[in-house]
UniProtKB/Swiss-Prot annotation:
Pfam (any one): Tryp_alpha_amyl
Superkingdom, natural source: Eukaryota
Keyword hit for Signal: yes
Species this chain originates from: Arabidopsis thaliana
MF GO annotations: lipid binding
Statement: the UniProt record of this protein carries the keyword Signal: yes
Key words, A-Z: Disulfide bond, Lipid-binding, Signal, Transport
Role summary: Plant non-specific lipid-transfer proteins transfer phospholipids as well as galactolipids across membranes. May play a role in wax or cutin deposition in the cell walls of expanding epidermal cells and certain secretory tissues.
Record-given protein name: Non-specific lipid-transfer protein 8
Length: 116
């Protein structure tokens, strides 16, 4: 086998076996993009959240795997929740009503220092 083929094989194997390390936590824009379909539900809705909202909640749950991601998402959610009036009961039940697990409720009173 020539040197180029060996390097190509090593490169391909490296893609699959070298662990990925995130340099930074999830961005607030990603959090907002995921939860944007939930805003009208959280502010004036009732019953179960719409499917598009739950899709965003599940996407966010999948994206917040590290402690840094969870804290960043918490800070973002808290800052947005402070700027709009959400129904507390809907915010608390959002993740469970969508069959997902988020690190925090969509609430302005959440304590982000305990998240992680």
């Amino acid at each position: 086998m020539n040197v180029l083929k060996c390097l190509a094989i090593i490169s391909v194997l490296g893609i699959f076996f070298i662990p990925r390390y995130s340099e930074s936590a999830i961005s607030c824009s990603v959090v907002l993009q995921d939860l944007q379909p939930c805003v009208s539900y959280l502010t004036s809705g009732s019953g179960n959240p719409p499917e598009t909202c739950c899709d965003g909640v599940k996407s966010l749950a999948a994206a917040t795997t590290t402690s840094a991601d969870k804290k960043a998402a918490c800070q973002c959610i808290k800052s947005v929740a402070n700027s709009v009036t959400v129904k507390p009961e809907l915010a608390q039940a959002l993740a469970s009503n969508c069959g997902a697990s988020l690190p925090v409720d969509a609430s302005p009173t959440v304590d982000c220092t305990t998240v992680g």
